[in-house]
C-alpha cells in the first residue's frame, strides 16, 4: 500500500449447495486470482462455505463439520497469500448456531464475527436455524481445527475491528447481510471505532427493484460513515427452489460507487480505496464521533499498488455527464446570482459596476449580474459594464465586451486609461519601456480605481470577477483586480468557469451565443503587455501552467489533503498521454510555491458566495497564515 491506497475485492463463487469441499476449492481459486491482482482484502458471500440455501441441513452435524473442514482447507491453501480473506459459514457455539464471518490471514483464523440481525419475515426464516450475536454475553473462544490439522482456539467477537500492523489506516469491520438493512447497523459503531472499510458478506435474493435499492443502501452507508463499503453477494449455485440470487457485488467509498458486478454473473470486482482520503474526511468533520472497541491485528507485507482500479476525474470540479453538468451549472449560477441579489438589496445599491474585459471571468460575472438583476426585477440598465482599454487590449476582447453589453441590454461605458496610466508612470518615474511587474500592476490598479470611483459616483457596488484558480495561484494584482465590493467568482475554478459560460451559450440564442463562444475561444490573458500583430501576446497558461492541471492539484490538495507525491501520482495516471512527467512535476512545483507565497492576497478577500466544497475564503473553509513556510511541500514536489 502506497499513498494510502489499498486494493480490495468482492467475489461471488460458483457454489454447490451443501458441497463444502467444492465450495472451498472455488473460494481458494478466486482468492488466489484476486491476490494475484494485488487485492489485500478479499470478501466472499454469506455462508459461502456451505451455501446460504441449505435450509434444515444447517441442523445436520455432517454439514457443520464439513464447513469447519472446508475452512481449514481455505486457511491452508491461502496461507501464502498477502491478503486477508473473509468467508462465511455456520458455527455452533455452546449449543447455539451462529451465522458467522471467518477472518483469515496467513493461514490462521483471526476471529469469527457473528451476524447480529437475523431476519424472519417474508422469504427469510433464518431464526429457524440461527441466533443473534446479541445472545453472546462477551467474547467466546471456539475450538476448531487449524490449517495444520491441530486444534486451536479462535475468538468469536462483536464490536471489533481488524487493523494492519504495517499500515495503521488499513482497518476494517464486518457485518453480515441483514445487518445493513436495519435502522442501526453494526457498521455504524464499527466505523466510529475506527474501521475505514466495512465488509458485508451477503446473500440477498433478487426481486424487481431490489438491485437499485441495494446499490443506494451501500453507497449511502459509505457516505454516512465516511468509509469504504465492500459488499459480496451470493449468486449462481445457490438453490433456486424459491429464490434467485444475482451475485450483486458492490464497492463504494464515501458515497461514490467505485465498482459493481454484472447481475447474474459470478466473478470478482476490484477497487482501489483511498484510506488517507477517508481518514482526512473524518478528521475534517468534527461531528464524526469516536467510540472504543476491541481490535485484532494482522500483518501484510507491503506491496506496490498500481492504481489499475482507481480513476481520477480529469476535471474534478466538473461533472462528466452532460445532463448532470447542465443541472450543476444552473444551480451554480442561481447560487451566485442569489448571493449577489441579496447583497444588492441589503446595500440598497442603485447600480452594479463590473469591469468587462471580454475574457472568461468578467463574462461570467456579467452573466451572474444579469441573473441577479432579473431576480430582483431591476432594469438591466442599472448594470454598468466598464471596458478600460490600455496597452495590452486587443480589438477582439474589446469588441466582445461591447457586444456582450449590447446583447444583454446593460449600460456600457468605455474609459480609456492609457493617459491616466502614462501620467501615473511619470509621477513615479516608471519607464513605459520597462515591461516589469510595475508596468502590469499599474494598469490593473488603475482599472480598480476607475471602478471604485464609478461605483461611488453612481451609488453602486463593484462586482469582482476573479476566480478560485487565480486565487490559489495568486494570479491577481494585490489591491487591483484582487479587490472588489463583492466577488461572485471566488468559489469557481477556471475549468468550471469555462463550462458555465458554455452553458449560458447553449441556453441563449442568436448573436449573444456567438459572442459567448468567441469568448470561450479566446486565450486566457490579463492583457497587461502590448499585443503582437494585434494578437494577445501574454497568455496566462504559458506563464503559470495549464489550468486543468492546477485545478486538479487544487482539488486534491484542499479537498482531501493529498501531499504532493500523491497528487503527482494521480496526475500521472489521469493525464497520461496529455502531459509528460516532467511537465506535471514542473507545474505542480509551481502550484505549491505560488499557493504558499500568495496566501496574503487570500487573507483579505472581499465577500462572496461559497458554491462548492473547495473554497479559499479566509472566513470559511481555508484559514492559513500568510507567513506559513512551504519547505515541506516544496521539497517533496521538487524531489519527485
List the predicted regions and their residue ranges.
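Enzyme catalytic cores with a strong preference for nitrogen-chemistry domains
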Residues: 1-355, 367, 371-380, 412
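ATP/NTP-dependent adenylation/nucleotidyl-transfer catalytic domains that generate, transfer
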Residues: 23, 168-170, 227, 236-239, ...
Amino acid at each position: 500500500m502506497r499513498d494510502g491506497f489499498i486494493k480490495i475485492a468482492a467475489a461471488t463463487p460458483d457454489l454447490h449447495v451443501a458441497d463444502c469441499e467444492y465450495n472451498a476449492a472455488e473460494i481458494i481459486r478466486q482468492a488466489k486470482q484476486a491476490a494475484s491482482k494485488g487485492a489485500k482484502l478479499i470478501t466472499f458471500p454469506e455462508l459461502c462455505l456451505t451455501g446460504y440455501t441449505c435450509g434444515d441441513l444447517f441442523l445436520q452435524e455432517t454439514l457443520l463439520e464439513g464447513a469447519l473442514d472446508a475452512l481449514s482447507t481455505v486457511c491452508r491453501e491461502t496461507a501464502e497469500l498477502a491478503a486477508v480473506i473473509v468467508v462465511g459459514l455456520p458455527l455452533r457455539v455452546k449449543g447455539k448456531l451462529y451465522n458467522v464471518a471467518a477472518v483469515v490471514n496467513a493461514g490462521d483464523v483471526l476471529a469469527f464475527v457473528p451476524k447480529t440481525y437475523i431476519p424472519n419475515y417474508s422469504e427469510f426464516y433464518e431464526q429457524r436455524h440461527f441466533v443473534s450475536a446479541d445472545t453472546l454475553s462477551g467474547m467466546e473462544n471456539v475450538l476448531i481445527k487449524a490449517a495444520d490439522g491441530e486444534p486451536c482456539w479462535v475468538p468469536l467477537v462483536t464490536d471489533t475491528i481488524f487493523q494492519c500492523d504495517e499500515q495503521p489506516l488499513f482497518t476494517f469491520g464486518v457485518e453480515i447481510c441483514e445487518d445493513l438493512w436495519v435502522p442501526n447497523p453494526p457498521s455504524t459503531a464499527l466505523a466510529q471505532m475506527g474501521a475505514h472499510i466495512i465488509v458485508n458478506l451477503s446473500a440477498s435474493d433478487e426481486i424487481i427493484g431490489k438491485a437499485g435499492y441495494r446499490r443506494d443502501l451501500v453507497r449511502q452507508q459509505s457516505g454516512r460513515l465516511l468509509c469504504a463499503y465492500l459488499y459480496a453477494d451470493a449468486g449462481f449455485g445457490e438453490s433456486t427452489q424459491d429464490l434467485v440470487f444475482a451475485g450483486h457485488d458492490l464497492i463504494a467509498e464515501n458515497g461514490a460507487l467505485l465498482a459493481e458486478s454484472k447481475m447474474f454473473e459470478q466473478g470478482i470486482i476490484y477497487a482501489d480505496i483511498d484510506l488517507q482520503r477517508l481518514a482526512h474526511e473524518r478528521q475534517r468533520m468534527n461531528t464524526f464521533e469516536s467510540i472504543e472497541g476491541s481490535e485484532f491485528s494482522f500483518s501484510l507485507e507491503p506491496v506496490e499498488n498500481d492504481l489499475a482500479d482507481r480513476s481520477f476525474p480529469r476535471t474534478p470540479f466538473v461533472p462528466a455527464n452532460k445532463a448532470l453538468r447542465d443541472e450543476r451549472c444552473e444551480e451554480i449560477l442561481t447560487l451566485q446570482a442569489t448571493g449577489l441579489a441579496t447583497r444588492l438589496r441589503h446595500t440598497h445599491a442603485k447600480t452594479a459596476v463590473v469591469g468587462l474585459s471580454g475574457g472568461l471571468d468578467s463574462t461570467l460575472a456579467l452573466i451572474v449580474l444579469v441573473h441577479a438583476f432579473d431576480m430582483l426585477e431591476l432594469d438591466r440598465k442599472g448594470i454598468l459594464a466598464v471596458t478600460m482599454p490600455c496597452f495590452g487590449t486587443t480589438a477582439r476582447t474589446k469588441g466582445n465586451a461591447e457586444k456582450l453589453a449590447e446583447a444583454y441590454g446593460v449600460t456600457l461605458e468605455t474609459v480609456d486609461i492609457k493617459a491616466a496610466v502614462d501620467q501615473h508612470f511619470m509621477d513615479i518615474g516608471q519607464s513605459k519601456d520597462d515591461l516589469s511587474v510595475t508596468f502590469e500592476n499599474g494598469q490593473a490598479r488603475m482599472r480598480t480605481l476607475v471602478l471604485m470611483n464609478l461605483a461611488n459616483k453612481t451609488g453602486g457596488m463593484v462586482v469582482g470577477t476573479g476566480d478560485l484558480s487565480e486565487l490559489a495561484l495568486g494570479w491577481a494584482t494585490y489591491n487591483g483586480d484582487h479587490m472588489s465590493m463583492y466577488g461572485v467568482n471566488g468559489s469557481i475554478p477556471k475549468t468550471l468557469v469555462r463550462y458555465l459560460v458554455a452553458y449560458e451559450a447553449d441556453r441563449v440564442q442568436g448573436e449573444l451565443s456567438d459572442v459567448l463562444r468567441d469568448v470561450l475561444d479566446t486565450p486566457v490573458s490579463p492583457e497587461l503587455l502590448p499585443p503582437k500583430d494585434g494578437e494577445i501576446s501574454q497568455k496566462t497558461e504559458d506563464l503559470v501552467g495549464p489550468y486543468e492541471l492546477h485545478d486538479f492539484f487544487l482539488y486534491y490538495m484542499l479537498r482531501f489533503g493529498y501531499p504532493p507525491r500523491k497528487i503527482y501520482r494521480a496526475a500521472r495516471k489521469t493525464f497520461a498521454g496529455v502531459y509528460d512527467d516532467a511537465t506535471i512535476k514542473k507545474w505542480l512545483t509551481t502550484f505549491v510555491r505560488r499557493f504558499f507565497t500568495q496566501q496574503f492576497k487570500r487573507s483579505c478577500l472581499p465577500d462572496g458566495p461559497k458554491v462548492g466544497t473547495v473554497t479559499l475564503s479566509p472566513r470559511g473553509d481555508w484559514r492559513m497564515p500568510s507567513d506559513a513556510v512551504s519547505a515541506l511541500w516544496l521539497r517533496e514536489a521538487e524531489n519527485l
